[in-house]
Amino acid sequence: SRKREGMTILPPFNTSEAGINTGRADALYGSISYISNSNKEYVLFTDCNVVCSMNYDKFIKAHIAKDADITIAYANGIPSKIENGTELIMDADGRVTGTGLVDCYSSSVNYSLKSMIIRRTLLERLLHEAHSAKIDDFETIVSKNIKHLRIYGYEQTGFVRVLDSLQSYYDVSLELLKLENRKQIFTAD
């Protein structure tokens, strides 16, 4: 049924052990029992501050076609002044070979949109690894495993903006008043 097979949104779950969540890995670990009991093969997670029109069917098909362990959505360009932004360093095939920190002085780079697809069982393993090492940021645990995992990038093209402040929210809202930008976000299909 739709209720059992559709998308599930996991809110951060605070436990008495963990207290307040300090990062994505910490928040996901709070829901580890739900994740472990799921029958889904893949998990997609994404931040809520990216404005774009992403085709998740194409995203998952690219993940499967590459036989990837993790696929990370990225955009190429000059990133906004995002804090803790991650640059993806990739080979010619799109495999992530390293990461770097995006700063406000960055030129055109492949920057992570913090959306990724991962096999559920691998997610569980990485969350346990992060929890035992007291790593609360999921991107840190992924970066530590770049040499051991098949991590690929998936380029998001078109209108892509990252909201990182009230000012950027206002600026992007103004950009969406332009018909050509709205057409890239709100498609007929």
Role assignments for model-derived ranges:
Residues 53-124, 129:
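Conserved core of the sugar-phosphate nucleotidyltransferase
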Residues 2-3, 7-8, 89-90, 141-146:
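Short, conserved catalytic or adaptor-binding loops enriched in Gly and charged residues
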Residues 16, 51-52, 80, 160-161:
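Glycine-/small-residue-rich active-site loops that bind phosphorylated ligands and cofactors
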Residues 1-51, 58:
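Conserved N-terminal catalytic core of the sugar/cofactor nucleotidyltransferase
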Residues 121, 130-189:
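Left-handed beta-helix
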